[in-house]
Amino acid sequence: MGKRPVKEALVGDLQKLLEKSSVVMVIDYRGLSVAEITGLRRRMREHGGTCVVAKNTLMGVATRETAWRNIDPLLAGPSAFLFGNEKLKEMLKTYEDFARETKKTEFRGAVVDGTLVTLDGLKAIADLPPKEVLLAQFAGALKVLPTKIAVGINQVPTKVAVGINEVPAGLARVLEALRKQKEEQQQPQAAA
């Protein structure tokens, strides 16, 4: 078997992983021993993730013409790819614990559903409530909206009526004040 079929098989494996993933984190694994990388793979598997060491060119070929093509700027130097789907928060914590213990890896970035993100961006995404909770909150907000609009519409005639009632009363007060002012001006002239 030549090199080309092996590379094509590796690209195919990477594409299958990408299809099943919603996030790919890219780390620099320079300086890690085989035992340390194996430990990271085991930890990632426990949280539904997959750790793969692959050549950047093969990952570039696997992501070409897909939503994952934004990973290209991260493909430099020795790269390990952490693929994940549902348990992003746990995967990120697992990686951060591993990085703190070994002090040998560097987080380059990640792609989440086709969007390139930094470590801070990934942490923000990981802190979001689950998709189901967000959908329930959105549905609740939509359900309340018509009620608020109806209450607002009902308030308009009331506010207009109050405003209309205030105009004559306000006008009467102004006219009364003008009458008193005129009387006060005429009294000093009459006294003089």
Swiss-Prot record:
InterPro entries: Ribosomal_uL10, Ribosomal_uL10-like_sf, Ribosomal_uL10_bac, Ribosomal_uL10_bac_type, Ribosomal_uL10_CS_bac. One of its GO terms (biological process) is translation. GO terms for cellular component: cytosolic large ribosomal subunit. Keywords: Ribonucleoprotein, Ribosomal protein, RNA-binding, rRNA-binding. It holds the Pfam family Ribosomal_L10. The keyword Ion transport does not apply. GO terms for molecular function: large ribosomal subunit rRNA binding; structural constituent of ribosome. The keyword rRNA-binding applies. Belongs to the universal ribosomal protein uL10 family. Forms part of the ribosomal stalk, playing a central role in the interaction of the ribosome with GTP-bound translation factors. Part of the ribosomal stalk of the 50S ribosomal subunit. The N-terminus interacts with L11 and the large rRNA to form the base of the stalk. The C-terminus forms an elongated spine to which L12 dimers bind in a sequential fashion forming a multimeric L10(L12)X complex. This is Large ribosomal subunit protein uL10.
